[in-house]
Amino acid sequence: VSHTIENHFPNHNTENDDGIIEWTKEIAQDTAEMVAHWMRVGFVHGVMNTDNMSIHGLTIDYGPYGWLEDYNPGWTPNTTDSSHRRYKFGNQPQIAAWNLARLLESISPLVEEPERLNEVLEHYITSFEKYNNNMWAAKLGFSKFLPEDEELVKELNKLLQEVETDMTIFFRELCSVTAPDISQLHESFYDPENIPVEGWNVWLEQWWLRVDATPDRDLMRINNPKYVLRNWMACLLYTSPSPRDKRQ
């Protein structure tokens, strides 16, 4: 631990409990920010074992990783995890917290008051909530997340699962909506004949009112990518017969 802090976290020290607490809080915050970005773009790590996590808040050692196509919080690209789906998309924030708790357990002998390490877990929870709320605000085109926005996001998550909805296309198309009319998002749905039109139009009316009919489209486009590395794209790249094809 001393070597790690001395070489990678020179602003911290291990001389007392305060130093270790502040160091691990930085790890917790960086981890929370990383996972919020995963959730923003639909990235699924696939194998969130403790040894596949970085104390620098970096995405490493992603094995059977992937990006959501239809918005499905239960999806995982890891076929060995298909029965329990421990590392599914919607579970990633909780798994990151669990992994952080294991890190804190391993360093607890180094602190005089190990119960203080609970402060670090609380810091992760509050940090993730902040990053997650900011993420949703940016994806939906308003600058600040308000408590009443929780219901708007909750209803959106529900609607996205009513009929198979392409996550990437939906949020990118939302950037260009000019009126609260679900027909403008028609290309986002895999089964457009069964779209819950009434539910969507109610939600769009609420969203349109929230953004005062002027969503921050630049902010939305920054946070809603037009392209992600879809699984079929990765397969094409992997099976391309020549280096030239791979460059394409």
What label would you give each PLM region?
Residues N52:
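Catalytic-loop signature of eukaryotic-like protein kinases
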Residues E33, A213-T214, R247:
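A short linear-motif detector with a strong N-terminal bias
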Residues H84, F89-S240:
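Regulatory N- and C-terminal appendages and interdomain linkers associated
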